[in-house]
């Protein structure tokens, strides 16, 4: 279809980073849409993002707010996420110490990655979009290693119903 100019790009949307390797082994894709957020370094540490960029594959990041969880106050976060209270404490302290909002940190992290071509966000109204655009400008402070997690129960929202 690409050769016939019926389509310009072939892409996939994945939910789990493990799906990506199998897709790349079997298909010639132009872009991948994937979950990416400030707590999750798996794609960075595995060099998967670099490999995608080197292959000329566009990366579109979604769920940069971890389905809104990163933006919730401690009072509004559902109790089932309390098992990560240590991580939430580190997150909150880092935000306070660096005088940055959760929105600013989450969006700036995603757009600061040179391997990421586009960042997709969902909004309910124009004001939210304006707020995200404004938050995207500015410096992202260094992120401490203790703020990263590989806990798939937290990082993959499809696991949240079992919590």
Predicted ranges, named:
Residues 1-155, 159-162:
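Beta/alpha (TIM)-barrel catalytic core signal, keyed to glycine-rich beta->alpha loops juxtaposed to Asp/Glu
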């Amino acid at each position: 279809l690409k050769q016939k100019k019926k389509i310009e790009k072939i892409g996939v949307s994945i939910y789990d980073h493990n799906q990506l390797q199998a897709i790349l082994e079997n298909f010639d894709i132009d872009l991948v849409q994937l979950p990416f957020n400030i707590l999750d370094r798996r794609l960075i540490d595995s060099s998967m993002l670099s490999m995608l960029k080197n292959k000329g594959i566009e990366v579109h990041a979604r769920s940069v707010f971890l389905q809104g969880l990163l933006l919730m106050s401690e009072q509004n976060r559902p109790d089932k996420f309390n098992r990560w209270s240590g991580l939430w404490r580190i997150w909150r302290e880092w935000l306070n110490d660096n005088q940055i909002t959760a929105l600013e940190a989450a969006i700036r992290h995603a757009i600061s990655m040179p391997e990421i071509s586009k960042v997709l966000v969902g909004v309910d109204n124009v004001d939210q979009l304006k707020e995200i655009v404004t938050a995207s400008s500015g410096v992202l402070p260094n992120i401490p290693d203790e703020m990263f997690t590989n806990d798939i129960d937290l990082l993959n929202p499809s696991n949240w119903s079992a919590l």
